[in-house]
């Protein structure tokens, strides 16, 4: 099997299967002294490559030599640097002009090695041996060669034709399935632009291809996965698709080698595809992006009126059939690309960098039909048209550019109703039926897929996809399918297929069929149909919610027939469903419609007429109304069946004519139509003032002059219910000449429209209101009150904010409002900047008329544009609320207050809100009167209301413990969390909770025991929440404050208020391998000294239960002051204790980590990809560390294993890469450092374990894993403490000893030296802190600033805080505003920065004692007016105090203080008791800055007492910080605490906090706070 394909006049492309010997013969036929085989290390592992190499060596000509060069794999190595290394190798080996280079590999190798050949010795011969499908059909052919640059891919290269391209299909046997499928994009592309026959052949073989490619055998060799795909079984198909694709490219290249015109046709799908690829790489592959690009560019061709909707549908279908994405929003593709956004402006910017472009004009290849491009080169397209195609939100501009004499003919697509019925009838019928004008839409796509899945008929296509051919087997081949039948939002398909499923036969593996759909489909009713089928012997289960999909239809039950009664007042489709399947029942069927007049009876008559066309005649009962008699039998398929155009869809172009005063003709719908909606023109538009001409087969409408439509007083639209939406938008601008008239159009007979894709009546009322149109909802209809003038139509808005028209994912809502949107401002003169109307979710029109927007734009002349989704803009401003759920006594009340304080949110207790709404007592009173069921119903209603109104408004909702008892409340919780809201499950030890609840008399008693309640609710709490916090019972004030700080950090982190910042400096984390952290809480602070994070090794915990693990995380948070946590589950093969194959438990643990909001998760790169991407897509604000360990020391640092793992980590877009090797010698550390230097794309933790590897831990730059002297054993071989690392690094010259001083006078009792030297000692730093006593700033400058080369910094105290400023080159904001410097920071080159950390001492003292980081809405108090008072005012302003009250013994200084600060600080001096009494604000924080060595002034004390009383209504305990270090309890502290129950913080804390701030600023590392505090405060 070998075919030679000519290109540029020579047969240099050879295509075969298993042609290894031919490849070698062909290469050695190129006479040379030197052959150089270049490949990457991945290809080098493939057995077929080794065989090729062996053959090459065996056949090497005498006197010739074979050289080999292996490059690192991946796009990251397709660089000028790699090219240079290859060239240096060739030169070092003495290669000359006669060298033949053989490039064996995929596109990266082919491109780069081709470029090497093009430039080495000014050009040497090259042979391409492509090993991937993409390389075989694309990159290896045509002579394009290149390398990447930091600014873009393939920017530097040359055209250099290879001597041969030797394609051996057998290589594909070892290709990973995703790479295989990726290559199919280029194969489909070439068929699409050039070869219609090959495209049709590809359509036919898609299923078998995907089955084979999806089921490879996978083996592992040295940690590398080897694929073995059974391409032998589809060899002919694979060979043909590769060959035909190559032929197309070869022909095009031969005609246009340098890509001046024709060759750029090969870029179909690439203009848009490359733009997506630029954003989504490396997660998305080239072919995947090109696949999306092809669909978008085909849609653009359709939008411009060039390509038919059928052809777009074919292209989309074949791409899906071969496993490729057709939209970036497909769930699997979105998860694969980690939910990356593709902003519209970014896409257009990326598209502007394209070699096809004409300067700034963007060019795109357009498609005329499958197999043929439009023209011979790419075409210029406008940004406006591109924006439209690239987005799902449409801007409709005023229709003021439509000529009033415009006369258009519009042919709508085939009827959805008739299309779906025809497919069912033909699938059940016997014989071949050619169905023409079938609607190509989402609905029919789902129906066709279902027919194929159920083996109902053989389906093929003719007339280039315009005709579908069904070869029916009379229903005998219907069998249960393996997969669920997913029907999207296709209501018609779901109802028809429910009855079809009743006729399906079981297989040996399956005895049921599952029918399911999207979220909306799972809300739409199907109960009456199910009830009738159940009563007739069919066993059907509701999988989820009663009365809705998903359904489980058991195929071992029998459709008995006989009399069937059906309630048909909701949907006529129930009737049609049973009618069409009735002939196949065991007995003749009598179908009686009960419950009142059936809805949409014309659709029932349509079904009966169609059944007659297929050979079954239904008789109407002569004795019972609405009763039908269906005989037993089989359908006989007519040879041809032509689908009539959709009459519902025809209403839109006809209404366009009515609204714009133009003429539109629909040529194939008239009075003889099967469809009731054909009456729309005569029954609705004509009475409203339109001129209507209708024949048996056509309808023409001419509208009156714009603004002259008349309201329709009453119309019964029961025969054409789907058309009522169109009537509503026409009625919106219809008015009488009477200015007192309400211009009311009344529409009735449409009750069924409430249960369509959405509640359409409610939808029209809601959306019309946005335009300023009033409506009334009727029991079975709607009243629309038309505007007096068309100029009164408003651009939709809520308040002053423009909003989009919501379409509810409903095609008819979208198409209707696309018409009204264009009438807004349509009578205004053309404006250079008109305001368009935004329509959301435009793609929903694909359900019945995918090309509607194209018709509106291209045929009817509307100006449309695309726009970035509103949600991207609104989400930035939204403050997603927090709902806290959990059992009573879980701490919800307390923690809800903390939550509100931490976020600055408003707090609402839902139980309290219920009681306020109830107004007659407490919840227990309501329950006593109405019962629990009614309470849950009302509770859910109120909850729904608050979420709808305040879910994005920054609230904390504290819920009752039983909120989750209601299924409706659970649905709301899940929906809220899915939309980005925070549902926090708060829990604690259940045994302690039970003990507490048994003593609580304040709530209504439960009938069940509390434990049973917990057992029932536990799973609900977990299912409904997206975050979880374990709140242990606190036994002391210290534990309580620790818990508060831990929770505050947790809630601020998960909500994104504070971010997890990856350190950019030298940093470390300590590894904890305890079985239970509870036993070590007192030592955890000491263990974590100097660390920037703490790792909990979950694989070492004694219990893997979710609650236990959650408790461990909370304990760790509270015991380490919220130090960032690294959550690690280390598997055995990666050096841990967790079982390697227990992936289910591992995934649960990782999801638990995300729910408890850990800062980092260590994610092993060897885990299954499904687990990895689940975590990556759920991570929110958690950072991911992609880790890989080589305990066996199997791979030196220059081995490709590390390169592959690094590329894998990049593709996963982890936040940090962590690689750990095992050093055998010191040289291993040097190799590691070379690796570190060349891999800087992501933050990298790279170390060697073992005694030889210790130096690598010292040299590692960020987050080095460390142990502690307080731990009994190390977590890994060779671990060092922070102090050991610093000491070794100092000895190596990495840290230079610095001297620090406290300057001022008197400083004899200063605790600064003790403070700082303790920190240096604990952390192993070489620095020293001393005293320099002086009252002269000049002395400080002379002896320290000018002459101390190793000066590390100065702590400045009185009297120098002002005098030192003149010697500072820079001042921080705090130093400027406070007007004093207490910290000097050397900048180098004899320059210094002045800072003030006194304010941080105050702020951090408050925050560490329970005050939120933001106290927005509260006020503060400062006692005193000296220098420290200025720091206090600055601190309270930074905390967010809305007002700062100041009091002092002498009032003169108060005015000076007020003038000192900017006006926005809102400082209010209090001088008299009356002023203090008049204060209405809540004071939550205070700082005392008056000296403590003398009694408190009486007047000052009186003022202070009055102000301390103003502390109610805070979400935290009001807190006062004392600035004086001694005594430990001052008079102000005693007053505040004992008399007014304020929390007081002694001055020692402020002293230490400000000193620690200095320490961390100077040394750029975390200070050991507790050790320092203990040293400073010891007597």
UniProtKB/Swiss-Prot annotation:
Residues covered by region (3-dehydroquinase): 1072-1284
- Give the start-end ranges of region 3-dehydroquinate synthase: 1-383
- Where located? Cytoplasm
User: What does the entry list as the binding residues for ATP?
Assistant: 886-893
Under catalytic activity, the entry for this protein gives: 7-phospho-2-dehydro-3-deoxy-D-arabino-heptonate = 3-dehydroquinate + phosphate; 3-dehydroquinate = 3-dehydroshikimate + H2O; shikimate + NADP(+) = 3-dehydroshikimate + NADPH + H(+); shikimate + ATP = 3-phosphoshikimate + ADP + H(+)
The residues that the entry says bind Zn(2+) are 186, 270, 286
Q: Predominant location of this chain?
A: cytoplasm
User: Which positions does UniProt annotate for 7-phospho-2-dehydro-3-deoxy-D-arabino-heptonate binding?
Assistant: 122, 138, 144, 154, 186-189, 249, 263-267, 270, 286, 355
Cite the EC number. Answer: 4.2.3.4, 2.5.1.19, 2.7.1.71, 4.2.1.10
Q: Where is this region: Shikimate dehydrogenase?
A: 1297-1579
What is the name attached to this protein's record?
Answer: Pentafunctional AROM polypeptide
Name the source organism.
Candida glabrata (strain ATCC 2001 / BCRC 20586 / JCM 3761 / NBRC 0622 / NRRL Y-65 / CBS 138)
This protein's gene is called ARO1
């Amino acid at each position: 099997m070998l075919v030679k394909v000519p290109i540029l006049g020579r047969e240099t492309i050879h295509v075969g299967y298993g042609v290894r010997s031919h490849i070698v013969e062909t290469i050695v036929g190129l006479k040379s002294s030197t052959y150089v085989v270049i490949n990457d290390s991945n290809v080098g592992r493939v057995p077929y490559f080794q065989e090729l190499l062996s053959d090459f060596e065996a056949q090497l000509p005498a006197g010739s030599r074979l050289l080999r060069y292996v490059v690192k794999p991946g796009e990251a190595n397709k660089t000028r640097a790699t090219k240079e290394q290859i060239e240096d190798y060739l030169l070092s080996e003495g290669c000359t002009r006669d060298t033949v280079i053989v490039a064996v590999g995929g596109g990266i190798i082919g491109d780069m090695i081709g470029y090497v050949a093009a430039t080495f010795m000014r050009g040497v011969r090259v042979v391409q041996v492509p090993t991937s499908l993409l390389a075989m059909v694309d990159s290896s052919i045509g002579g394009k060669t290149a390398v990447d640059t930091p600014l873009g891919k393939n920017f530097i290269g040359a055209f250099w034709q290879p001597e041969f391209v030797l394609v051996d299909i057998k290589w594909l046997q070892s290709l990973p399935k995703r790479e295989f499928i990726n290559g199919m994009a280029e194969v489909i592309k070439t068929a699409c632009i050039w070869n219609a026959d090959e495209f049709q052949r590809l359509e036919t073989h898609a299923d078998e291809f995907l089955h084979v490619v999806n089921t490879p055998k996978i083996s592992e060799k040295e940690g590398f996965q080897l694929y073995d795909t059974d391409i032998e079984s589809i060899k002919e198909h694979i060979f043909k698709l590769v060959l035909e694709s190559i032929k197309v490219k070869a022909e095009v290249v031969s005609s246009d080698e340098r890509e001046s015109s024709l060759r750029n046709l090969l870029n179909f799908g690439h203009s848009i595809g490359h733009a997506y690829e630029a954003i989504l790489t490396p997660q998305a592959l080239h072919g995947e992006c090109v696949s999306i690009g092809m669909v978008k560019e085909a849609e653009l061709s359709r939008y411009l009126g060039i390509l038919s909707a059928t052809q777009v549908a074919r292209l989309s279908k074949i791409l899906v059939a071969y496993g490729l994405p057709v939209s970036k929003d497909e769930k699997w593709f979105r998860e694969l690309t980690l939910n990356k956004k593709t902003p519209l402006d970014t896409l257009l910017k990326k598209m502007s960098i394209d070699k096809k472009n004409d300067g700034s004009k963007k060019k795109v290849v357009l498609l005329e039909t499958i197999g043929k491009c439009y023209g011979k080169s790419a075409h210029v397209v406008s940004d406006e048209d591109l924006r439209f195609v690239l987005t799902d939100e449409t801007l409709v501009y005023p229709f003021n550019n439509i000529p009033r004499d415009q006369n258009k003919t519009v042919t709508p697509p085939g009827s959805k109703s008739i299309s779906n019925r025809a497919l069912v009838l033909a699938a059940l019928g016997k014989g071949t039926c050619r169905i023409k004008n079938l609607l190509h839409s989402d609905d029919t796509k789902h129906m066709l897929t279902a027919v194929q899945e159920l083996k109902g008929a053989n389906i093929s296509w003719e007339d280039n996809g315009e005709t579908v051919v069904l070869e029916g087997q009379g229903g005998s081949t219907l069998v249960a399918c393996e997969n669920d039948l997913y029907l999207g939002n296709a209501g018609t398909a779901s109802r028809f297929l429910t009855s079809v499923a009743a006729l399906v036969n079981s297989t040996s593996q399956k005895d049921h069929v599952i029918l399911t759909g999207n979220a909306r489909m799972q809300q739409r009713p199907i109960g009456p149909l199910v009830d009738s089928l159940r009563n007739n012997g069919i066993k059907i289960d509701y999988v989820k919610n009663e009365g809705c999909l998903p359904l489980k239809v058991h195929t071992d039950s029998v459709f008995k027939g006989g009399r069937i009664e059906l309630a048909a007042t909701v949907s006529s489709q129930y009737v049609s469903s049973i009618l069409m399947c009735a002939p196949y029942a065991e007995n003749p069927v009598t179908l009686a419609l009960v419950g009142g007049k059936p809805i949409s009876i014309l659709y029932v008559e349509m079904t009966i007429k169609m059944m007659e066309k297929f050979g079954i005649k239904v008789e109407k009962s002569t004795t019972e109304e609405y009763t039908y008699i269906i005989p037993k039998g089989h359908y006989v398929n007519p040879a041809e069946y032509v689908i009539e155009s959709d009459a519902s869809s025809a209403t839109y172009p006809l209404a366009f004519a009515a609204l714009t005063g133009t003429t539109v003709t629909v040529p194939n719908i008239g009075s003889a139509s099967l469809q009731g909606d054909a009456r729309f023109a005569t029954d609705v538009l004509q009475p409203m003032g339109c001129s209507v001409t209708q024949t048996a087969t056509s309808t023409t409408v001419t509208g009156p002059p714009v603004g002259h439509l008349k309201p329709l007083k009453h119309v019964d639209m029961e025969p054409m219910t789907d058309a009522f939406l169109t009537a509503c938008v026409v009625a919106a601008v219809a008015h009488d000449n009477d200015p007192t008239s309400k211009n009311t159009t009344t529409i009735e007979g449409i009750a069924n429209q409430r249960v369509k894709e959405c509640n359409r009546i409610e939808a029209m009322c809601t959306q019309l209101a946005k335009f300023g149109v009033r409506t009334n909802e009727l029991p079975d209809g709607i009243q629309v009150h038309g505007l007096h003038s068309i100029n009164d139509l408003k651009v939709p808005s809520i308040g002053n904010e423009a909003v989009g028209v919501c379409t509810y994912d409903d095609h008819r809502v979208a198409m209707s409002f696309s018409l009204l949107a264009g009438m807004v401002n349509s009578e205004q003169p053309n404006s250079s900047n008109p305001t368009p109307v935004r329509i959301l979710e435009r793609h929903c029109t694909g359900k019945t008329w995918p090309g509607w927007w194209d018709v509106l734009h291209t045929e009817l002349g509307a100006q449309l544009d695309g726009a970035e989704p509103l949600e991207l803009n609104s989400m930035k401003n939204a403050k997603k609320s927090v709902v806290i759920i959990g059992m009573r006594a879980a701490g919800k009340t307390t923690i809800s207050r903390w939550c509100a304080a931490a976020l600055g949110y408003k707090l609402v207790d839902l139980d309290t809100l219920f009681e306020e709404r109830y107004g007659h007592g407490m919840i227990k009173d309501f329950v006593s009167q109405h019962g629990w069921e009614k309470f849950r119903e009302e509770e859910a209603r109120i909850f729904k209301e608050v979420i709808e109104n305040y879910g994005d408004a920054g609230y904390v909702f504290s819920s009752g413990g039983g909120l989750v008892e209601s299924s409706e409340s659970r649905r709301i919780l899940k929906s809220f969390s899915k939309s980005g809201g925070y549902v926090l499950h708060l829990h604690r030890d259940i045994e302690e909770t039970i003990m507490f609840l048994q003593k609580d008399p304040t709530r209504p008693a439960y009938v069940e025991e509390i434990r049973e309640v917990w057992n029932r609710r536990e799973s609900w709490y977990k299912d409904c929440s997206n975050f979880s916090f374990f709140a242990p019972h606190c036994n002391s004030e210290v534990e309580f404050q620790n818990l508060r700080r831990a929770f505050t950090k947790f809630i601020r982190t998960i909500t994104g208020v504070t971010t997890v910042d990856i350190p950019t400096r030298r940093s470390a984390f300590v590894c904890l391998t305890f079985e239970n952290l509870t036993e070590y809480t007192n030592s955890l602070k000491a263990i974590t000294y100097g660390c920037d994070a703490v790792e909990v090794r979950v694989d070492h915990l004694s219990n893997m239960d979710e609650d236990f693990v959650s408790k461990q995380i909370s304990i760790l948070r509270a015991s380490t002051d919220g130090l960032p946590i690294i959550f690690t589950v280390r598997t055995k093969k990666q050096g841990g204790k967790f079982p390697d194959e227990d992936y289910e438990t591992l995934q649960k643990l990782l999801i638990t980590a995300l729910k408890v909001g850990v800062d980092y998760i260590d994610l092993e790169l060897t885990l299954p990809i499904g687990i990895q991407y689940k975590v990556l897509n759920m991570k929110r604000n958690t950072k991911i560390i992609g880790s890989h360990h080589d305990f066996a020391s199997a791979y030196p640092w220059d081995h490709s294993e590390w390169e592959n793992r690094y590329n894998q980590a990049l593709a996963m877009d982890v936040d940090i890469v962590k690689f750990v090797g095992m050093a055998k010698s010191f040289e291993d550390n040097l190799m590691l450092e070379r690796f570190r230097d060349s891999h800087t794309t992501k933050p990298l933790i790279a170390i060697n374990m073992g005694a030889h590897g210790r130096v690598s831990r010292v040299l590692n730059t960020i987050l080095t894993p460390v142990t502690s002297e307080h731990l009994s054993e190390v977590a890994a071989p060779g671990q060092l403490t922070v102090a050991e690392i610093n000491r070794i690094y100092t000895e190596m010259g990495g840290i230079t000893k610095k001297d620090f001083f406290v300057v001022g006078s008197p400083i004899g009792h200063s605790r600064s030296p003790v403070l700082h030297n303790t920190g240096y000692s604990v952390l192993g730093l070489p620095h020293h802190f001393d005293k320099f006593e002086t009252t002269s700033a000049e002395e400080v400058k002379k002896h320290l600033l000018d002459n101390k080369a190793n000066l590390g910094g100065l702590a400045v105290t009185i009297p120098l805080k002002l005098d030192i400023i003149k010697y500072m080159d820079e001042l921080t904001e705090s130093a400027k505003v406070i007007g004093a410097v207490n910290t000097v920071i050397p900048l180098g080159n004899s320059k210094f920065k002045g800072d003030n950390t006194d304010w941080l001492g105050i702020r951090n003292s408050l925050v560490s004692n329970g005050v939120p980081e933001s106290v927005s809405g509260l006020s503060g108090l400062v006692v005193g007016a000296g220098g420290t008072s200025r720091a206090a005012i600055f601190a309270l302003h930074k905390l967010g105090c809305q007002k700062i009250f100041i009091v002092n013994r002498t009032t003169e200084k108060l005015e000076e203080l007020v003038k000192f600060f900017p006006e926005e600080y809102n400082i209010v001096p209090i001088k008299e008791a009356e002023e203090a009494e008049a204060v209405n604000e809540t004071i939550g924080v205070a700082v005392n800055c008056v000296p403590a060595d003398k009694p408190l002034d009486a007047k000052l004390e009186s003022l202070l007492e009055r102000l301390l009383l103003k502390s109610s209504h805070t979400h935290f305990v009001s807190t006062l910080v004392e600035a004086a270090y001694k005594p430990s309890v001052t008079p102000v502290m005693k007053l505040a605490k004992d008399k007014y129950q304020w929390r007081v913080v002694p001055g020692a804390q402020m002293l230490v906090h400000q000193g620690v701030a200095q320490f961390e600023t100077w040394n750029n590392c975390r200070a050991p706070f507790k050790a320092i505090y203990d040293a400073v405060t010891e007597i």
